[in-house]
Amino acid sequence: MLIPRITQMRTRAVRMQPTRGKRCVPSYPDEDSKLRASGLQVRRGGNCPNTLEVLQQLLREERGAHGSDKVRPYLVTCLPSRSAPATGRVIESFGVGTLVDFSRCIFREENQDPASSYIIRSLATGSRTLVNYNDLAEMTFDEFVAATEGLGGYDTWYHFEGRIPATTLQCIQWLRRSDPKARVSIEVEKPGREGLEELVAEADVVFFSRSWAESKLYMSAEECLRAQSAKARRGSHLFCTWGSQGAACTLPDGATVSCPAMGSGETIRVIDTVGAGDTFIAGILFGFLHHEHSWDNRTKLSFAVQVATCKVQQEGFNDLGFKALAQMDRGGIGA
């Protein structure tokens, strides 16, 4: 391991959503009807950018406490033109003096608009309806190779959203040849997306969503992990989140660890679940990147569940790193 440790967080084909609009309505509207929204929020989205935003907070809190500067996160994704206002808003959304390096992004100079997602949330039922639009061409395998040139040779970690499984598989297989010491994590989230299970066999760490697991008729996080562990790469860690029931992890030795989101008798007020899975991933990556040996696997899992639980109790991601680490300092995480 090099000191300072330089770890590249990289993702292929992340859907950037700097103009993600979240509209709250009294109830879901009927077709061809008019309804006044109760509220409107506009913020940057995208699975991996969300994860990086929370990871950046955790790293900053840790740096402030220990003066450590061993992790350097990168984002590799497709953005509109360098001069497009939307591109500037994406980068600015990470804050002044961001730890995230955007120099490896791919800019589509012919585009001015980012991918966008519009979320309609019903106050009556809590349901969320998403409408996506993306005119940006997806990243190709050759573009990924060019964008990540020269980044190998360190203690590296690549995280993929798993948007285009066939291309993602090419990228991971190329990494195994060109940078065999690199670790790879993959998110298996969207139900019905062909090719995701093939990625499980290639990754060191896999994150399964509850919606994907239920689409495969698994009744619990543990059942999903038991079934998928037979397909996984040897020595891998598999994680599956399950909403209010917390999450579970299958370890390289085959053991399964579970962690509830709340203690017995506890209740929380759920305000905003958008990005909770991305937040959980940030917590796990932080555990591996910054506390691989000082935290055991149960502590890593408990911490990630706690960060995600903090997230669903607020709008957006502000101060999640501070809140989660402060609770850990009070002895509220781990076993």
For the regions a protein language model found, what residue spans apply to each?
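Thr-Gly-centered strand-to-loop micro-motif
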Residues: S38, F160, I186-E187, V270, ...
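Conserved short C-terminal alpha-helix that flanks the catalytic cleft of nucleotide-sugar-dependent
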Residues: K311-V312
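Conserved active-site and cofactor/substrate-binding residues in soluble primary-metabolism enzymes
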Residues: G46-N50, A86, D113, T279, ...
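Short, small-residue alpha-helix embedded
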Residues: N50-L55, V270-N297
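Ribokinase/PfkB-type carbohydrate-kinase core domain
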Residues: M1-T19, G64-V71, C78, E92-S264, ...
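Glycine-rich phosphate/adenosyl-contacting loop at the front of the ribokinase-like
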Residues: M1-Y74, A86, L130, D155, ...
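Acidic, glycine-rich active-site loops and adjacent beta-strand->loop/helix elements
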Residues: C78-A84
